[in-house]
UniProtKB/Swiss-Prot annotation:
Observed phenotype of the null mutant: Severe size reduction of all organs. Abnormal cell wall composition.
Keywords: Acetylation, Endosome, Golgi apparatus, Membrane, Transmembrane, Transmembrane helix
Zinc recorded as keyword: no
Residue pairs linked by disulfide bridges in the UniProt entry: none
Compartments, as annotated in UniProt: Golgi apparatus, trans-Golgi network membrane; Early endosome membrane
Signal peptide segment: none
Protein known as: Golgi apparatus membrane protein-like protein ECHIDNA
Residues that span the membrane, as ranges: 35-55, 108-128, 132-152
A single GO cellular-component term on record: trans-Golgi network membrane
PTM-bearing positions, type N-acetylmethionine: M1
Pfam families, per the entry: DUF846
Function noted in UniProt: Mediates trans-Golgi-network trafficking and cell elongation. Required for keeping the appropriate balance between secretory trafficking and vacuolar targeting of a subset of proteins. The ECH/YIP4 complex is involved in the modulation of the trans-Golgi network (TGN)-mediated trafficking of some proteins and cell wall components (e.g. pectin and hemicellulose) to the cell wall in dark-grown hypocotyls and in secretory cells of the seed coat.
Length: 186
């Protein structure tokens, strides 16, 4: 209780602090290494390899671990027999999605967008300084971040669409059974 005798609402903590840590850690590691690497390394190859490796680890962790745990979504892309790209989505049911921790979800989405914005800004700096080689590093990292943004955004929309279809089918079937039972009694 506070001095004014008002009851304070409980502060919601992160439900999955380790997952949140690794979700942020790999993004931060890739960005920090890229930004600070010029101070410690003269070799573009080392900077390229380590930065892209950290960004790839971030991509994998977000796509396969933190996306599933923090927001209940997972996506992947397959090439079918006709050579067409097919998006596949997994999501928790709507009830489970509604129970997801709001802080975890907030952290997931904001860091996803902020990391992409940071890579974009670094790309602009590379353009201004006429560093095409560093623009390549930024382009790879930005592409990985944008792929996750697109994948998870499509997955979230697909989950909402599936819920709406399920709700309309449930309502229609209940209405149909109510109408049938009404006519059966007559």
């Amino acid at each position: 209780m506070d001095p004014n005798n008002q009851i304070q609402a409980p502060v919601e903590n992160y439900a999955n602090p380790r997952t949140c840590l690794f979700h942020v850690l790999f993004k931060g590691a890739a960005l920090a290494f890229y930004i600070l690497s010029a101070l410690f390394f003269n070799s573009f190859v080392i900077i390229f390899v380590v930065t892209v490796l950290l960004a790839a680890l971030d991509f994998w962790v977000v796509k396969n671990v933190s996306g599933r745990i923090l927001v209940g979504l997972r996506w992947w892309n397959e090439i079918n027999d006709l050579g067409e790209s097919v998006w596949k989505f997994e999501s928790l049911d709507q009830e489970s999605l509604a129970r997801m921790n709001k802080k975890d979800s907030w952290l997931f989405w904001w860091t996803l967008y902020l990391a992409a914005a940071a890579w974009f800004i670094l790309g602009v700096f590379s353009l201004i300084r006429f560093q095409a080689d560093y623009l390549l590093v930024v382009g790879v990292c930005l592409s990985l971040n944008v792929a996750n943004i697109i994948g998870f955004t499509k997955c979230k929309k697909d989950a909402k669409k599936q819920f709406q279809q399920f709700a309309s089918q449930t309502i229609a079937s209940r209405f149909q059974s109510t109408v049938q039972s009404a006519f059966t009694l007559v």
